Structure formats: C-alpha cells, structure tokens
Amino acid sequence: MAEYGTLLQDLTNNITLEDLEQLKSACKEDIPSEKSEEITTGSAWFSFLESHNKLDKDNLSYIEHIFEISRRPDLLTMVVDYRTRVLKISEEEELDTKLTRIPSAKKYKDIIRQPSEEEIIKLAPPPKKA
C-alpha cells in the first residue's frame, strides 16, 4: 500500500531529533533502553514499532496515542487524515473497530454526546451595579 509508505515518509520528514527523543520517551515502556539508543531517526522508530506489532498499515492507534500525548496535533492530523481517507474509518466508526485508541472508550460510547436543551444549566444574568 503506497499510501502507508507515503504517510510514514511524511511523518518522518516532520520529526526532528528533539521530537524523536520526546516520542521515544512517550513510549519508553515499549522500547528497552538499549534499543532506544539505537533509534536515531524517525524511520528507525517506525521500523521498531512495526517489528514489535505496534504499527502497521491497518492499525495506527498506537502512534495516534503517542502523537496525542506528545502534543503533536500536526502529526496526529496526518494519521487521522490517512485513516479517514485511505482506510475509510471515521471517528464515529472507530469506536466500533479494533482501531479504538482507548479500549475502555466503547463502554462510554453512548455517554459521549451533546447535552440536550433541558440538560444545559442556564446561568443567571450578572448583578446590576448600584
């Protein structure tokens, strides 16, 4: 799948050495320290994740989570765009698939919604100055 390779290349091009250290730190529980030292490029990081079943063309949830906690919305947006455009999976559908970032999210699926007009708390106007 050429789109997947393009996605990884685009992500790699947007990851600096400083970013890479932050990303490795965010997933330090999954990367042994001796391996972490060997990972010196974004592509090496992606290769490590692929070889340890944390990443593949149909499952990007791990890096979505890492980009989210690393505060990299630009990288996360690229992954979400790939997921919706290439894999044809939207945010709503994601709750019902294996791509769910947080497994416990399924039980809250029906709770996550906009409040109805009756549920919105109305605030009183501010007091008038004397």
From Swiss-Prot:
Query: Where is the PTM Phosphoserine found along the chain?
Result: S61, S90, S104, S116
Give residue ranges for domain DED: 3-81
The protein's name in its UniProt record: Astrocytic phosphoprotein PEA-15
Assembly notes:
Binds RPS6KA3, MAPK3 and MAPK1. Interacts with CASP8 and FADD. Transient interaction with PLD1 and PLD2.
Principal subcellular localization: cytoplasm
Which cysteines are cross-linked by disulfides? none
Q: Which domain of life is it from?
A: Eukaryota
Q: Other comments?
A: Increases PLD1 and PLD2 levels, possibly by stabilizing the protein.
Q: Which SMART domains match?
A: DED (SM00031)
Q: Name one Pfam family in it.
A: DED
Q: Which PROSITE patterns match?
A: DED (PS50168)
Which organism does this sequence originate in? Answer: Mus musculus (Mouse)
* Function noted in UniProt: Blocks Ras-mediated inhibition of integrin activation and modulates the ERK MAP kinase cascade. Inhibits RPS6KA3 activities by retaining it in the cytoplasm. Inhibits both TNFRSF6- and TNFRSF1A-mediated CASP8 activity and apoptosis. Regulates glucose transport by controlling both the content of SLC2A1 glucose transporters on the plasma membrane and the insulin-dependent trafficking of SLC2A4 from the cell interior to the surface.
